[in-house]
């Protein structure tokens, strides 16, 4: 058999992703409870988490579900689940790569109309926990370490209120305990408002401009068990319409910052001042608007160094006719709008994107893009014949900072049309190739295995914090080979309402060894030389 050649950034090599959902035993169906009254939550959910809840080395899967909605529903109602068909679902991965539904045993069915999920070990006991966002009140599930979870929301003080969407864990004050950012969409209830034409079949979901913005929630982890809501004390008082949140230290000052994708208003970039407070710098950093100075419908987001200059960049998805926004880090606290120079403008103009993550699908050392797509309005084709409610997911190959659409050649899944929403990435089978899960509104979830043929090498790290938080979230990992230097922030956040594998993954191209540097949240810098490729390497934080 002839050996496969190693890909180079200039090669337009497609991926190969295979839908293994049914073969893996995943039978989840999202129930959005669509009604003729077009209540907005019906079209917005929901998310997914890829995480290893039992520490067996294999990723498990958590899928968020809706709840019944009556037509009409009285204003002020908070929908609740009333049967197993509306349960959120936890799937445990067996030794053979198939999944078993363990929701009932684990006790993580959810309570209300679910939106998103964020996974991380908030109490540093070695087991990842789950925070589930909902319309109304959210839920914190503590992982007991025996295959079960306990609802500790009330004790922890993190129920929140309103309509929560994406959430992310981050140790913003670097005290060794993970804090929690929770986005809220807007001030909305079940008032019966007619939007769209009065013609039969033309009623539409209402535009967010009709509703008031609302502040996000920031919970400080006090002692590993209790949280305190500190958004006002932290200087986070500007109201938004938040849908996506991503974490990175974009200015290399040692403190994690975060970006909020807002819907149809300016975007927010919160700079961590290093004293427990944040400053919103979206406009001055040139990330608050698009390249033409306009707002857009920000939905999904990811913070990642796509051009391998070791500085985190930003991608934000939005609605059709707006173009996905790519911001290249200028190394001085500002960003350049790179949508045109990267090739994204022409590729994404007619598409609507939600969940998005940078991933190196072919392990050539350059971060590619995977995007879940679909319009928010199921009536969009009635007014705009060139736009579609159901869309195919999109795979874009990064060729040295320029993106090429390789979707059509990358598997049958990229020809299917879905109402895509959430997206999480992770190495499901630990073969060194990044896989993905995409959720759809009122439809199935799809497990996509990466079968891309490539001789390129790879390296994945599993960080174990000691002075830092146990998951190492917020650590900046730099991997250097003879040809490339790459950097990733350790995070489970980003995308839309979803949570990805915490283990940072690096494609190495032809290189068989790499040097690794980890800047832990504690301030400790740890270096490993000549690390052999093709492995998942566990790295425990040094004590000093």
Predicted regions and their residues:
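Hydrophobic beta-strand segments that make up the repeating blades of beta-propeller
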Residues: 58-65, 125-134, 180-184, 257-262, ...
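Blade-edge beta-strand/turn elements of extracellular beta-propeller
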Residues: 17-20, 98-108, 146-158, 225-236, ...
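Beta-propeller blade signature
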Residues: 86-93, 214-222, 271, 328, ...
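Repeat-based blade/solenoid architectures
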Residues: 26-47, 84, 106-118, 157-168, ...
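Short, conserved, GDST-rich strand-edge loop motifs in beta-rich repeat architectures
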Residues: 64-83, 184-211, 371-389
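Gly/Ser/Thr/Pro-enriched helix-cap/hinge segments flanking short amphipathic alpha-helices
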Residues: 34, 343-346, 378, 386-544
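Beta-propeller blade termini
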Residues: 45-55, 92, 113-127, 142, ...
